């Protein structure tokens, strides 16, 4: 047990001290509202109406230096609309964003030290691959075809705020910094109860996205570090429940008989007690556990997770919320990056004939296949006003004020991302229907802008090469560029291709 404690404390030994003075540095606020770090592909940039100017920041820092008591109670936050004599919401938001930058410093230094041994090009290549929303499918294809059971786990939240602060204190020892953290949490949440996900977390994440994502990612990182430690130790610990008893009974009296008769049975018996490798994958607020053997071990790990959440994080979770399914009988659904996905293992039979009059050999192979969820995609298109609930294309009035190139570019980007994301599916009939809806919706939007008819616009479309190129299928463009290899390209395009260039969220979510 002492060895395990040392292992758990090893990564926390390099604790960072005295981060609180960074709050008073003007350069930190320049990083917060600078062009480089403010832009994010996941969080929409917040318009502060130039309220975070350097002059206001300098006045805020001066005010903080002159303030004697930095700890503000929850009643003061609720009663007063002025924060240290100024607008509470504005300055609290500015300081919380700077706080997120400051607490990210020690974790960024650890990440940088872990990447020092790699080449720059290799780091960029691997980073772009991991950023891809599509990277989950090659993982499924490589690992899940050999597995039998999968469990989709919802990572429970919210966590009690005091527990979160105590966990953060393991990594950073700076009391003033945690007093400031409690002040922010007092402002947005009720300290004496659990967070209400529908109210407090929603308002907190919208007003302070960087701060919220740091706290949530830190909680997930702490949970995963303990879980992966337990998984690693369970696969390497010496298991003595049955083997020691077996050896004590038969070793002295029948050692020759044991070695000669039971070597294979003895090894197979030990393998039943040894935990196999559990595959773990996390995406957004969920995680996936997959195993090859019987569901008994999956049930064991399910109760491990529940005990970890309840005892260590004080988060209540019911065993019935974690389901264990057999991959051969169930399809696996998940929602990631704004895309609906449905993964299934199909059994394909390969028949081979040795000689003309000889016997046939049938080999059953597992093949990972993705199904295009046509109904959820049509609901998303209807919500974004590209079609009605029945899937009939309609115009997009909000985009009618844009230029022709801007309208076509937006429709093309949405269609290309959806096409690339679901191109790994073997059945593309539903995908062609989605392309048709977007293409006709784009035409109707342009017709609405120019106050014309669909027939007149299609005639114009045939005379303009620029518009014609935008409405040409990608496989048609490839066949025009490489006419001799058109048949090969058609087979390639009809196959299963995983694109690793999808790093942005679904445009249906962003532009709805």
From Swiss-Prot:
GO BP: any one term: tRNA processing
Swiss-Prot/TrEMBL keywords: Chloroplast, mRNA processing, Plastid, RNA-binding, tRNA processing
GO molecular function (one): RNA binding
Main subcellular location: plastid
InterPro entries: Domain_X (IPR024937), Maturase_MatK (IPR002866), Maturase_MatK_N (IPR024942)
Protein's cellular compartments: Plastid, Chloroplast
UniProt keyword annotation of Cytoplasm present: no
Coiled-coil region: none
Any single GO CC term annotated in Swiss-Prot or TrEMBL for this entry: chloroplast
Protein family membership: Belongs to the intron maturase 2 family. MatK subfamily.
Entry function: Usually encoded in the trnK tRNA gene intron. Probably assists in splicing its own and other chloroplast group II introns.
Protein name, as recorded: Maturase K
Species the sequence originates in: Dalea wrightii
């Amino acid at each position: 047990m002492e060895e395990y404690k040392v292992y758990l404390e090893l990564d926390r030994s390099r604790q960072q001290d005295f981060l609180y003075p960074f709050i008073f540095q003007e350069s930190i606020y320049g990083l917060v509202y600078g062009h480089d770090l403010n832009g994010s592909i996941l969080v929409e940039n917040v318009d502060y109406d130039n309220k975070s100017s350097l002059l206001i920041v300098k006045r805020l820092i001066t005010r903080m230096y002159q303030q004697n008591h930095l700890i503000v109670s929850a009643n003061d936050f609720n009663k007063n609309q002025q924060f240290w004599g100024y607008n509470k919401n504005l300055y609290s938001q500015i300081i919380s964003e700077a706080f997120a930058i400051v607490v990210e410093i020690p974790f960024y230094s650890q990440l940088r030290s872990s990447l020092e041994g790699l080449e720059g090009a290799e780091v960029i290549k691997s980073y772009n691959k991991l950023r891809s929303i599509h990277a989950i499918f090659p993982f499924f294809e490589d690992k899940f075809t050999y597995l039998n059971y999968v469990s989709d786990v919802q990572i429970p939240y919210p966590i009690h705020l005091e527990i979160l602060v105590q966990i953060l204190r393991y990594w950073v020892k700076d009391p003033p910094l945690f007093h400031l953290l409690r002040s922010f949490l007092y402002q947005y949440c009720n300290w004496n109860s659990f967070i209400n996900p529908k109210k407090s977390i929603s308002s907190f994440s919208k007003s302070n996205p960087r701060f919220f994502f740091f706290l949530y990612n830190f909680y997930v990182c702490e949970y995963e570090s303990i879980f992966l430690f337990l998984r690693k130790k369970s696969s390497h610990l010496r298991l003595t429940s049955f083997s020691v008893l077996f050896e004590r009974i038969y070793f002295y009296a029948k050692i020759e008989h044991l070695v000669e008769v039971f070597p294979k049975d003895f090894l197979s018996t030990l393998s039943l007690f040894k935990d196999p490798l559990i595959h773990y994958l996390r995406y957004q607020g969920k995680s996936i556990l997959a195993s090859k053997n019987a569901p008994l071990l999956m049930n064991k790990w399910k109760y491990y997770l529940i005990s970890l959440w309840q005892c260590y994080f004080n988060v209540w979770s019911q065993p019935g919320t974690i389901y264990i399914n057999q991959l051969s009988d169930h399809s696996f659904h998940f929602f990631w990056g704004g895309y609906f996905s449905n993964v299934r293992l199909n059994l394909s039979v390969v028949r081979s004939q040795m000689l003309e009059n000889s016997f046939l050999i049938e080999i059953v192979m597992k093949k990972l296949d993705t199904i295009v969820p046509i109904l959820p995609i049509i609901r998303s298109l209807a919500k974004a006003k590209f079609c009605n609930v029945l899937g009939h294309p309609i115009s997009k009035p909000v985009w009618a004020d844009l230029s022709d190139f801007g309208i076509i570019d937006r429709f093309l980007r949405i269609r290309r991302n959806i096409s690339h994301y679901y191109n790994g599916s073997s059945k593309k009939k539903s995908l062609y229907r989605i392309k048709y809806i977007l293409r006709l919706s784009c035409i109707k939007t342009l017709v609405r802008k120019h106050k014309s008819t669909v027939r007149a616009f299609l005639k114009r479309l045939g005379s303009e090469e620029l518009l014609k190129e935008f409405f040409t299928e990608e496989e048609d463009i490839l066949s025009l560029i490489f006419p001799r290899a058109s048949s090969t390209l058609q087979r390639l395009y009809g196959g299963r291709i995983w694109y690793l260039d999808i790093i942005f969220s679904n445009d249906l979510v962003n532009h709805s």
